[in-house]
UniProtKB/Swiss-Prot annotation:
Biological classification of the source: Bacteria, Bacillati, Mycoplasmatota, Mycoplasmoidales, Mycoplasmoidaceae
Reaction catalysed by this enzyme: cytidine(34) in tRNA(Ile2) + L-lysine + ATP = lysidine(34) in tRNA(Ile2) + AMP + diphosphate + H(+)
InterPro entries: Rossmann-like_a/b/a_fold, TilS/TtcA_N, tRNA_Ile_lys_synt, tRNA_Ile_lys_synt_N
GO BP field: tRNA modification
Enzyme class name: ligase
Function: Ligates lysine onto the cytidine present at position 34 of the AUA codon-specific tRNA(Ile) that contains the anticodon CAU, in an ATP-dependent manner. Cytidine is converted to lysidine, thus changing the amino acid specificity of the tRNA from methionine to isoleucine.
Cell compartment(s), UniProt: Cytoplasm
Source domain of life: Bacteria
GO MF terms, alphabetically ordered: ATP binding; tRNA(Ile)-lysidine synthase activity
Protein name, entry field: tRNA(Ile)-lysidine synthase
SUPFAM superfamilies xref list: Adenine nucleotide alpha hydrolases-like (SSF52402)
Length: 290
């Protein structure tokens, strides 16, 4: 990491983000905490983050969600949007585009297992250590640690943290996967992690070969030419096209984009809040709306 105080950091009050806050305090310009007001212990978590930021002398922005907000069916997606909207606002305020998040290796294998369970081909399995999303450069410095290692470090260095009791409840698919993985031995987790990393490496190598063949298409992304490739290659080409334009999307969105470019679909497809994909003169094009 480069110069001082150039990152904002998402901190929930859990062991992961509290360890990250302590380890990278000299790099953090401001902490963002979102209180969703969905648990009886939400205020407890907020107060812990407030106290620790005060102790470390780090500015804090707390975004409190209206307790009367009607949550949609997919709570996690809605919560993520709220969270990233606040990250973007705070990053703009501090004139940066760099964000620290505290995902770790258990999060990585949870995500990978969810992707495999869904039986959908992905261009990357798990969670990237670095990526770009919603105009923010995201860094995940704890990806080298397992959850139990993080807890051990917190206890060793007397770093306070709270526990989200709902993580143990099978109310979301991610929680179900987490509870299943908790039954695995450390060796099983390590083996799964290594296997996923190998899978990602193979995908990247295949993508490199594909890109050499498809340089012309990336310069002029004709949807008719795209359909001459296999479905897997189509997904990888769309992914590469968007990455080239600094737009990060997941596998589900790429599937939706493939559906979108078929005839008789809507004229524009929302990629991010103000970025839309469209088909113009039989070619993919991006539309930016302010």
């Amino acid at each position: 990491m480069a110069s001082e105080k150039q990152y904002i950091a998402g901190v929930s009050g859990g062991s992961d983000s509290m360890l990250m806050l302590k380890l990278y305090q000299k790099k953090i310009a401001c902490v963002v905490h979102v209180n969703y007001n969905t648990r009886s212990t939400s205020l407890r978590d907020q107060k812990l983050v407030e106290q620790y930021c005060q102790k470390l002398n780090i500015p804090l922005v707390v975004h409190t969600v209206d307790p009367d907000l009607v949550w949609k069916k997919n709570f996690q997606n809605q919560a993520r949007k709220i969270r990233f909207d606040q990250f973007k606002k705070t990053a703009k305020l501090y004139q940066t585009n760099k964000l620290l998040l505290a995902h770790h290796r258990d999060d990585f294998i949870e995500q990978a297992k969810m992707q495999l369970d869904a039986k959908k081909r992905a261009v990357y399995y798990g969670i990237k250590t670095r990526c770009e999303l919603y105009g923010l450069k995201i860094y995940r410095p704890l990806m080298k640690y397992w959850k139990d290692e993080i807890i051990a470090l917190c206890r060793q260095d007397h770093i306070p943290y709270e526990i989200d009791e709902t993580n143990k409840l099978p109310i979301y698919k991610r929680n179900e996967v987490r509870l299943e993985i908790e039954k695995w031995s450390k060796i099983e987790k390590e083996q799964f992690y290594i296997a996923i990393c190998a899978m990602n490496k193979t995908i990247a190598q295949k993508l490199f070969v594909l890109m050499k063949k498809a340089k012309k298409w990336l310069l002029q992304p004709d949807v008719r030419e795209l359909k001459r490739f296999s479905i897997i290659d189509q997904k990888q080409l769309i992914y590469s096209y968007l990455i080239y334009h600094k737009i990060n999307v997941n596998g589900e969105k790429i599937d939706a984009i493939l559906d979108f470019i078929q005839p008789s679909q809507q004229k524009q497809y929302r990629l991010q809040n103000d970025i839309f994909l469209m088909v113009k003169n039989q070619c993919l094009a991006l539309l930016y709306k302010s």
